Amino acid sequence: MWKTKFRHMPLIMITISLAVVIVAVMGCAQALQEDEGKDPIIFSDRQWESVWAANEIAQFIIEEGYEHPTETETVSSEAFQIGMEKGDVDVDMELWRMNLPEWYDEATEEGFLIDVGPIYERSVQAWYVPRYVVEGDEERGIEPMAPDLETVEDLKDYADLFEDPDDPDRGRFINGISGWEVTEVNSVKMEIYGLDEHYNIVEPGSASALDSAIASAFEAGEPLFFYYWEPTWLLGKYDVVRIEEPEYDPDVRKQLDLIVEGELSVDEVDEACAFIETDIRTGVHSSLQDRAPGVFEFLEEMEIGTDPINQVLAYMQDEEADPEEAAMWYFENFEEDWRSWLPTDVEENVEDALSEAGVELSG
């Protein structure tokens, strides 16, 4: 078939046709090489819902708007620190620096970590019990179980209320997940407060296991003593009472961190404190400034906000949406916000990609 066509074509037309094919192939190969030549930007995933959503939003913009590949690496707090120092991790969308104060100070001073600004303007992490434990819930027919419970000291009197089903003689504290720095801090605080003598400390193996343990207790109207944080869908959905601790003190917190790092014995410390309330920031490896300056500038501009991310997380929970679907919902419902982060050409690329994905935009 092809022989017949070429046999009746003038030589000059054959030459031109072949030249066009060669140029097209070379162009595709060059484009492929250019794309392959870009090292992917590595995002850390420390396994909680808000960072999954934030990663999806940022990675979509980077891949579609800046045409730069990205990847996600699941890491523990320790692995994240090592990876950022070595340059194996490029972006940490939720740098909870208050949980890593010593490392954060060293990393920013040495210069391999750049704090590019807040992703959420406020955050809270603390120890909680359901409000119905303290006040009851008339609609659900729940009587107050611990009407005098207010402080960490009071918890010593209520260990039997928060009974560990696997060890009925002791109470149970639901800690953060294994591998988080804050989980170790919580364990140290439990010991300093003297609560380790009354409670077993349970560390769920994943964020989903943590959420399931808490949500199932709330739905059943059962007593529960647990650690959690905001922004999250869970604290947006369930009514809680925060357990009072001594006010945050940077010197006291430094001692807690030294214990976690093995540089100080818990026996040498007799006080602990609440977590600091602050914003959550994005951390970027310094090499990204040269490798992808446009992406670096975008990350400096990107701020989702606490209320918007809470709405995204509520959407994920209510609609059983995955992080990618939640990101599309964010793009559709907070269009003015994300457009403000981007230069015009990148904004147009993102708009085209969202249109192809079926996202309806007003702009």
Q: Language model features by range: what are they?
A:
Residues P101, D115-G117, I192-G194, N200-Q311:
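Flexible, solvent-exposed loop/hinge segments that line or gate ligand/substrate-binding clefts
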Residues L113-I174:
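A conserved helix-loop-strand patch within extracytoplasmic ligand-binding domains
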Residues N55, V75-F112, A213-S216, W233-Y238:
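Pocket-flanking alpha-helical
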